[in-house]
Amino acid sequence: MNNYTAYVTIKDRIATVILNNPSEGNIIDEGMASTLNSIFIKLNEDENIAVVVISATGPVFSIGRTQISSELSIHERRQILHDLNISDNLTRLRVPTIASINGDAMEHGLEIALCADIRICSTSTRFRCNDLYNGSAFPIDGGTQRLPRVIGTSWTMDMLLTGRIVDAQEALSIGLVNKVVKNDILENTTSELASLIASGATIANQYAKEAVYSGMEINLTDGLRLETDLNVILQSTYDRSEGIKSFLEKRPPIFKGE
């Protein structure tokens, strides 16, 4: 068994990042956050990676983060919050990301899942954002910003203000996850999706991701210009010409990410 609180495996251009502290509910502490950030930075520099999957060992995805003492100074607290930040490096990944949520994703665990482009969960998974409800904390890693972008303002306020548990089926109905599958097929379902994405044109996938997320932060006119610019750039790539050539030759394309 791997002794690290988080680690990565790479196979067939798919990197699987695994939270690995099941005895503690895969709780996010400074050590795990540091390891995850290092992994994400290195993966973003690896041009051979086409897809990143985030998963966890044990019966839960992550039940949250380590408690921060109320006796700390503002400076000390700010430093710990900075050290616990994972979302910045996760969302900077150029390639598509999939959260394979194998169990409860609470508080910081939910915030990590929100950073993924696609979320698949098991039928036993529950979600909760109870930082405000328990009165001891406040979202620290993008929860108040990414949750409404995924499920809308009303559902976000519902989850934040009540701290209630959202089960897998409700999560699917409000758009929090893309798919719900039985626990015993979650890994295979995720693997099949990751393989499908990895078989596509890596550069085109990256440009699509850039267009969608950057477009959400600018007006429609500028977003359309960005889409056009990326389209023009894409036409000059090897993968674009290979896609056309393979179609004409009636064979599977062999993309190089170039």
Give the predicted meaning of each segment:
Residues M1-A15, D46, A56, F61, ...:
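C-terminal alpha-helix plus adjacent terminal tail
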Residues M1-T57:
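Conserved CoA-thioester-binding segment of acyl-CoA-metabolizing enzymes
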Residues A6, N89-I203, T237, K245, ...:
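Crotonase-fold acyl-CoA enzyme core
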Residues V17, N21, T35-L36, I54, ...:
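Terminal peptide-recognition signature
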Residues M32-L36, H82, I112, L186, ...:
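Hydrophobic alpha-helical membrane-association signature
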Residues S34, I41-K42, N48, S55-R92, ...:
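Glycine- (often His-adjacent) and acidic-residue-rich active-site loop
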Residues H82-I86, G143-R146, W155, Y207, ...:
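Hydrophobic alpha-helical segments typical of transmembrane helices
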